[in-house]
Amino acid sequence: MILETPRLRLRRCQEADRHAFAALHAHPEVMRDYGGPLDRAQSDAKLDRYIAAFARHGFARWAIEDRGGVFLGYAGVMPSPPAHPLGPHAEIGWRLMRDAWGHGYATEAASAALRDAFTRCRLTEVIAYTAADNPRSQAVMARLDLRRDPARDFSAVYESGIWHGLVWSTP
């Protein structure tokens, strides 16, 4: 299955994406808001989760490619992990290679993923969350017509320490 936009192709993540995922997750600027770069094993585990989520739930993060087949990153809706502070939910997220920033790709890809989540997957709500000091992601959330939902803001402990998430939700 492939989702297409005017400039992008979104496809299921696959084994062949391991090298590109590792490069994406190793970039310090890309990973600044996520506790820093991931090593290869951590990056591979993330890809494995996306592949497994698609097989189990029918939705997950999509690999993003330009029309020439160049890997730009990923975007899509994931089911929450069982122990998430917000309980069960579907969360949209994205991460792009550094040289893909500033071209509107995150908004374009996430918009296609949201449409798929509501139409094909029949989800009724999708949320997003980001750090308070990540205005780029907050701007994407606003362009996706998500609304701030401060009553659901949360804190969680991750490998990198305590993380405070600002929540946005679909209208």
Question: Model segments located where?
Answer:
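A short helix-loop-beta-strand connector motif used in the catalytic cores of GNAT acetyltransferases and
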Residues: 51-63
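Acyl-donor (CoA/ACP) binding surface of acyl/acetyltransferases
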Residues: 1-33, 61-171
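Conserved GNAT-fold acetyl-CoA-binding loop/helix
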Residues: 29-49, 60
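An amphipathic alpha-helix signature
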Residues: 15-22, 40, 44-48, 55
